């Protein structure tokens, strides 16, 4: 489920939350996202940041969105389901092949989830590389159904090699 494409005004709202610390955008965006979800998964999780990036930024925008969305939908949120065990360069501007390589072994599942239907929350999905890695971890432990809830999606970057 996605609110829309990465363009004005959604792109501005996401940018303000992520880079300008305008935290009031999180509940607003979560409410917009909730309107797109007819049958929510019983458990939400979010895309984790490496501890260094979280320390530098001071917060994880996907975590903020997931917390707000869980409140709006009145469902469980597990903020510790995943961890990012390896710091990776920013994904922005990388080709699909570079993103896949960049994320190799970057994530770990901290514990088996307590549900068979889970939704992963992220702010922006571009190629889906990050989401794909997290889905693989969930599928490996027997999760039956995975939904993706994001604010924006972007067109796949042009890559003549990938």
What do these predicted ranges mean?
Residues 124:
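Basic, glycine-rich
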Residues 1-119, 127-162:
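Conserved PRPP/pyrophosphate-binding segment of the phosphoribosyltransferase/PRPP-pathway fold
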């Amino acid at each position: 489920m996605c609110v829309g494409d990465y363009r004005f005004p959604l792109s501005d709202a996401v940018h303000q939350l992520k880079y300008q610390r305008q935290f009031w955008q999180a509940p607003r965006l979560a409410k917009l996202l909730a309107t797109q979800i007819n049958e929510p998964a019983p458990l939400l999780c979010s895309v984790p940041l490496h501890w260094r990036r979280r320390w530098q930024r001071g917060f994880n925008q996907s975590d903020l969105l997931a917390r707000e969305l869980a409140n709006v939908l009145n469902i469980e949120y597990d903020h510790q389901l995943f961890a990012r065990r390896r710091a990776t360069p920013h994904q922005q501007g990388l080709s699909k092949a570079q993103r896949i390589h960049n994320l190799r072994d970057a994530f770990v599942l901290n514990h088996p989830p307590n549900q068979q239907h889970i939704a992963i929350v992220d702010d922006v999905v571009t190629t889906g590389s990050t989401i794909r890695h997290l889905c693989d971890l969930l599928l490996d432990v027997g999760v039956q159904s995975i939904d993706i809830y994001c604010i924006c999606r972007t067109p796949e970057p042009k890559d003549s090699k990938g």
